[in-house]
Amino acid sequence: MTAARKQVENSSDGHGAAIKGKRGRNRIGAGRRRMILAPLMATSVLSASIVLAQADTGGAFATDPADWPEKEAGIPVTDALTVEKCGTCHAPDDKGNLSRISWIRATPEGWAQAIKRMVKLNGLSITPEEARSVTRYLGTWHGLAPEEAKPVMYIPERRILDETIIPNETLHNGCAACHAFGQPMSSRRSRREWGLLQNMHKALYTQAAVQIERDAEDQPGTIKPPMKKLTRGEVALDWLTQNAGLHTKAWAEWRPRIRTPRLAGTWLVSGTMRGHGRFVGEMTIAPDGDDFTTTTTLRSLDTGKVLTRSGKGLVYGGYSWRGSSKSGTAPARPDDLAATARETVWIAPDQSRGEGRWYWGEYHEFGLDVTMTRVTGAPVLAAVSPLGVKTGSKATEVHIYGASLPTGLAAGDLDFGSGVTVRKVSVLSPSEAVATIDVADDAPVGQHDVALGGVVLARALPVYAGIDYMKVTPETALAHLGGIKYGKGYEQFEAIGWSKGLDGKQGTDDDFPIMPVDATFAMKEFQTVTYDNDTRFIGKLDPSGFFTPNVEGPNPERRFSRNNYGEVWVVATAKSLKNKEGQPMTAQAYLVTTVPAYKRWDQPEVSE
């Protein structure tokens, strides 16, 4: 396998082992997604601070972290139910701190996993309703600041992606070899708590002990022969203490700003889903005690089909939305937007906008990427269509979707950037207008902003001279066999046309995506094992790029009766686009189809 995928929903939580509770599903599979990353930081970032940290903890790694004195101030626990349910084992002190708990901050999912573990390992007696209340308190007052949570929102959004936040090879091999690095970065802890977390990993996972005790790949320059090399655990502890400590500037600034979420009203929603295109619509949020109910209407910009959903949601920490919604119509396909979905949205601290994912599927593989903007009566912009315009084009009609668009909108009120002239504007409704534009031959290529007065829709309209090449997304993908005992894990591929940008060179930073390309899809053998014929056994790829995996279990038709796992190239061939040789433009992605995930960690209760 030349590349790999990180399956964030199959990762253990930042507190260690995840334990199955009454309402959670926990599986971990041999097909957990991996990725091979180059080191992202030079070894120079690790310095003598590690040695100093060792001295500060009395030899640190020569002693048990459980014996280290806790030198940092804790965060007092002020919720009566949390004290009642947790305080028996987690002894309180005279400052209102509960042992362990007061020296950890985490996401709602992290606290939910910790509660499940206490039930399973320590016999905690707690009802589902009480657990939700404790999770809400801890996820708010012992949670993350918005700017701490945003870089790792892909964890609660259940996105499957290649992580870019791993700082060096040591932490890649010591932490992210088994779970997403976003898991530890979804919590903040004192140095002692990071040490105790390593202890728990070594106690519960045999392989973790081996990984943590190996020599670190990134050794500080202060370590010279014959000095003993630092272990991965030592380097990781120092890095996490410095970069994910309990007390941070972000938390100190956010803690006094936490307030009751006031989200009631109308929100403009725009979204995209691979293989399904773009959607615009409105969500109406109404208060329901401490929670909310929602009614959402979405319209496809490709087909015009309208979908209505209703649901509920709650907010942790004043900014972190968790919800669920359904359409009331039975889904016709696994990827049908009518399916019941869970919702994770990061809401801006000023509660004016949000961004996140509504997702479903056995592996959460289907999802709508959404942005939300509060409707206040002032103009709001959500999307434009078509997705791109070509240089030199004349009298092109561009539909603008938003809210509270002025009825007297004039050509001079709109700005599409340099080289684009607005000839006229027609307002069809407060939520849609049509602008007729000309694009100059020498208009700068790139993603242009669309502006209406002081309202800007950033990078909304690609201006391009031509589609220079294609990419298939996702570029690396993982599907799961299933259909007999376990559910299938599907995958949807899409071909996207790209521009080389201003420099005319492919693969540089100024390249930009333009729009989906009409293409057909087929599988091609990925040559790793002779005569394995993976294209025959792993599943079916339809011409639209939707992959359905085969069933799990031994297959007597395969050599050695192997399972139907395998790896292939997914090749997209454009129906009309040609390359410079006059041949149909092509691109390919890498697909691994593996066995079911037999154990999985999930916290659906945080959305209830």
Give the positions of each predicted feature.
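Electrostatic cytochrome c docking/interface patches
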Residues: 54-82, 122-123, 130, 145-169, ...
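The canonical Cys-X-X-Cys-His
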Residues: 83-93, 134, 171-183
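Gly/Gly-Pro-rich "capping" loops immediately C-terminal to redox-active cysteine motifs
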Residues: 91-121, 180-206, 308-310, 314-315
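C-terminal capping alpha-helices of c-type cytochrome domains
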Residues: 123-153, 207, 212-258
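Central antiparallel beta-sheet cores of small beta-barrel/beta-sandwich binding domains
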Residues: 179-180, 257, 261-350, 355-358
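Edge beta-strand at a domain terminus
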Residues: 249, 340-342, 346-383, 587-597
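Beta-strand/beta-sandwich contexts
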Residues: 373-413, 455-508, 604-605
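Immunoglobulin-like IPT/TIG beta-sandwich domains and homologous Ig-like subdomains
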Residues: 392-454, 515-517, 535-536, 543-546, ...
